[in-house]
Amino acid sequence: MTDYKSTLNLPQTSFAMKANLAQREPQTLKRWQKENLYQQIRQARAGREKFILHDGPPYANGEIHIGHAVNKILKDIIVKAKTLSGFDAPYIPGWDCHGLPIEHNVEKKVGKAGVKVDFATFRKKCREYAAKQVAGQKEGFVRLGVLADWDKPYLTMDYKTEADIVRALGKIVANGHLVRGFKPVYWSVVGGSALAEAEVEYQEKTSFSIDVKYAVKDEADFTQRVAELGGEGPVSVVIWTTTPWTLPSSQAVSLNADLEYVVVQQPGARLLVAEALLESVGKRAGIDTATIVGRCHGRDLENLVLQHPFYTREVPVILGDHVTTDAGTGCVHTAPDHGMEDFEVGSRYGIGTLNYVDENGLYRESVEIFAGDHVYKVDEKIIELLESRDALLHQEKFTHSYPHCWRTKTPLIFRATPQWFISMTKNGLLDTVKTAVDGVEWIPDWGEARMRSMLEASPDWCISRQRTWGVPIALFVHKETQDLHPDTPALVEKVAALIETDGMDAWFNLNPEEILGEDAANYSKVTDTLDVWFDSGVTHYSVIQQREELQYPADLYLEGSDQHRGWFQSSLKTAIAINGTAPYKQVLTHGFTVDANGKKMSKSIGNTVSPQKVMNELGADVLRLWVAATDFSGDMSVSDEILMRTADSYRRIRNTMRYFMSNLNGFDPAINSVAFDDMVALDRWAVDRAAKLQRDIVACYDSYQFHTIYQKIHNFCIVDMGGFYLDIIKDRVYTMQEDSRARRSAQTAQYLIVQALVRWIAPILSFTADEIWQALPGEKTGPVFVAEWLELPELSEDDALNNSYWQTAAKVKTAVNKVLESKRSSGVIGGSLGAEVTLYASDELHAKLNSLGEELRFVLLVSAVNLKKLDEAPEDADQVDVVGLKVAVTKSEAAKCARCWHQRDDVGSHSEHPELCGRCVSNVEGNGEVRHYA
C-alpha cells in the first residue's frame, strides 16, 4: 500500500499548543523592556488624536491585591484598544505616597516623630518606605502585562508634584474657596487627626443607648405653651442618644417644628416625647403610655428653657429639620462640638462650640466632673451620674452602624477643631460642581445619581490634617487676626519653587523672614498638612496639566464604585475650584471582587485570591481573560474554580488560533494571497463574517463592554470557525495542490482572520497576541500593539452566496449532523465519510443548495450527496429542524480513498494509483482539483 502522507499539506506552526504562560510571560516582558515597547507605541502614534485615561493613584502600601489587578487590567485593555483605534493614548501610572498608613509603618520601625526621632528624619524614612512600596507594586503591575510609562510614573511625593499640589492650593485660595473654621469634623483619636468623608467607613458597633430626662425649668411657661395641660408632677423632655460621652457638651434640645408632641403622665412625673414615637419609647423604657395629659407642636416649645441633666447649665429648646421619627424620642440633645447637624442648627441660634475634648479624646482639665477621662471609657460614669440625679429613664446596649476610620478600623468621634476647609457654599462652588455633573458621561449611568446624592450631603471639605508625612499647607496667617497674608498667591509660588528643588522639608525648615522679611514678626507658618485626598484630587492639575504628553480634561477616569465618594468627588471639586471645569469627560466604575458565593474577600476568612499566585500558576493572560469575561459593572466573582474554568476557555481560544496558524504552513502573504473577489465563496463568507464581527467588537471596546467581546470572540472561534468553517476547509487545505487557487484562498482567508483576531484579543490576551504576532508569516511593521484594526473586505448584500446563504447552509449541516450521529449510534454507518446523504428540499431550499453543485458534499462532510425535491421524500426519511427539508442517510458502498478517506465510485480508476479517487489523482499528479464554493 502506497503512503501518500508526503502528498498532503499537513499543518505545522511554531505557535506552541501548550501555552506555558507562567514561564513564557516573564521572558516576553524582558523582550518588551529591551525593545522599549511603550516608547515604540508613543512614536508610532505621535501627532494622532489623543485619548487620556488618567490613572487614579493606588496607595503605596503593601502588595498588589486582586482589586488592584482588576483596575489596572481594565485600564490597560482600554488604552490598548484605543491605540488600535489609532489614538495616541499615553498611560502614566501614579501612586499616592503620603498619609497615615505609611506613618504608622514607619513609627513601628523608628518610633514616633518628635519623640524618638526628629521630624526631618521621620519624613525621610517615610519617603524611603513609600519608594520601596512603589517599587514592589510596580513589579506586580508590570507582571500583569500593563503597558505604561513605568520609567516616569507620577508619585505624589515627587518634589515637582508636591510643589504643584501646593500651587493647586494657591489657586484655590486665589479663587476664594479656602476658609478657616472651627467646625466638627470626623476625628480619629487613635491617629490624632481629622478625616475626610472619603476616609470614613461604617461598621457595626455596640454602644449604650440611653433615654435621658431634661427637666423643664419654668413650668408656668410650659403650661402656657401646651394647650389644656393636665396631670401632675415635674415635666421633663426625654432625649435618646447612643453617645452618652457627648452629654457634657450638650447645649440645646432640638425638636421638629411640625411634629406633634405629647405629655404622658407617669407616677409623680410627666414626660414629653413625639407622639409618633410614644409606643416605641414606651416599650423600650417601660413607661406608661396610656394617659396623655397634653399636646403641642414642636414650634410651640421654641426657646423653652430646660435644665442640663447634671450641670447647672440652662438648655434651650431649638427647632431643626434634622429631627425625625425614624428612631429615638423626637427630641434630640444637641452638642455643636460633636455633630455637623448639631453645629448647623446651633449656629442658627448663636450657640457655638465648647471644645471640651482634646485631640487624644480626653476631656480637658477645665471640664467639670470628667477632666482627664477618655471619651471611649466614660459612658458608664455618665450613666451612673444620670442615675444619681434621677435623670436616667432607661439604658440598654444597642448595636448600630457607626463611623470608623477606614485605615485603623477604630471608631471615630465628631470633634470641633480649627481646620482649613474648601467652602462648598462660598462663591457657589457646590452649585457649579453639581452643574458640572451634567456634562460628564457616567458609566454605568447610575453613577450620576450616586454622585449627585453624595453632593447633596456635601459639607465643606476639611483638607487639613495634623500629620508629619504630608504636603504642607504652605500658608502664613496673621498671629492676631488669623487672616491669610494678603500676598498669599505670590508667597505660595515662592514656597512651591523651594519645594520643587528640596521637597516638603523646604517648608518645614523655612525661616519666615526669608520670604516675609519684616512681616515675619506678625505672621505664623501653618503647620498642618493636606488631606491625602487633596493630593490625589488635584492630579488633574499637578499631573495632567504639567506633562506635555497629556491633555486636560482627561477623557476617562476609571476606578471602583467607592470612588464616587472618594477620588471622583475630590477631583471634581478641586477641578471646579481651580479651572471651573470638570477634570474628566467620562467616569467609568467597576465593582468589587467577591468570592464564588458573593462574599467580600477577607484574609481572615481565607477567601482571597492572590494575583501573584494566579500569574505564577496559570499566567497573567488567564487573569486578564477572567477580568474581560466578567461583567465588571457589578461585583466580580473570582475563585480558584472560576479561574480554572477561565483557563479552559483560554485553551479553546488558543487551540483555534493554533489551528489557523498551522494551516498557514508554507503561506507567504506577499506572494500567495488571493484577491477577495477571486476567493472560494465560503472563504469570502468567513472573511465577511470576521469583518462584520470586528465592527461589533470595536464598538464594544468603545463602550467598555469587554465581557461581550469575550463572548463574541469565543462564539466566533468555537461555533462559526471551529463548528463550521474549519471543519469544511480541512479537506481543501490538506488534500489540494499546495499552490492551487482554492487552497491559497483558504490560507488567505485564515491569514486575514488571524490578523484580525490577534488584534481583537491583543488588549485582553496581550502576551498570547504578541506570541501569535511573532509566529505569523509575512512582513510586520512593528509589534501588534502599534497595529490598527485590520481593514477587511465584505460581501455585498446582493451576493447570492452572502451571509444569509451560509447561515442556511450551516443550519442544514447541523440538521444532517444530527441524523448522521443517529445512524452512527445505531450502527448504520461508521464515520460521516462512510455515508451517502439524500436531501429532500423545498423548491427554494433546493435551489439554494443546488447552487453548490458537487461541492455540497464538502460542506456536509460526507462522501456523496443526492439532492431531490421535497415531495419525493419517502416515508422513512428523517424529519429535521430545518423547514422544507427531510434527510435520508445510507451507508456508502463505494471504496475508500487512501488519501482523502472519501468513499467514491472512481477509487481505483487510475492504474498507477489504484487506491485513490479521481480528484486525489488530479491533486497528486494532474492539473489539480478546482473549487468555487467550498
From Swiss-Prot:
**SUPFAM superfamilies assigned to the protein according to its UniProt record, in alphabetical order:** Anticodon-binding domain of a subclass of class I aminoacyl-tRNA synthetases, Nucleotidylyl transferase, ValRS/IleRS/LeuRS editing domain
* Residues annotated as binding ATP: 603
Q: What class of enzyme is it?
A: ligase
Q: Which InterPro entries match?
A: aa-tRNA-synth_I_CS, aa-tRNA-synth_Ia, Anticodon_Ile_BEm, Ile-tRNA-ligase, Ile-tRNA-ligase_type1, Ile-tRNA_ligase, M/V/L/I-tRNA-synth_anticd-bd, Rossmann-like_a/b/a_fold
- Known catalytic reactions: tRNA(Ile) + L-isoleucine + ATP = L-isoleucyl-tRNA(Ile) + AMP + diphosphate
Q: Which UniProt keywords apply?
A: Aminoacyl-tRNA synthetase, ATP-binding, Cytoplasm, Ligase, Metal-binding, Nucleotide-binding, Protein biosynthesis, Zinc
Location of motif 'HIGH' region in this chain is 58-68
> In which residues does the motif 'KMSKS' region occur?
600-604
Return the protein name.
Answer: Isoleucine--tRNA ligase
What does the organism's lineage look like at the top?
Answer: Bacteria, Pseudomonadati, Pseudomonadota, Gammaproteobacteria, Cellvibrionales
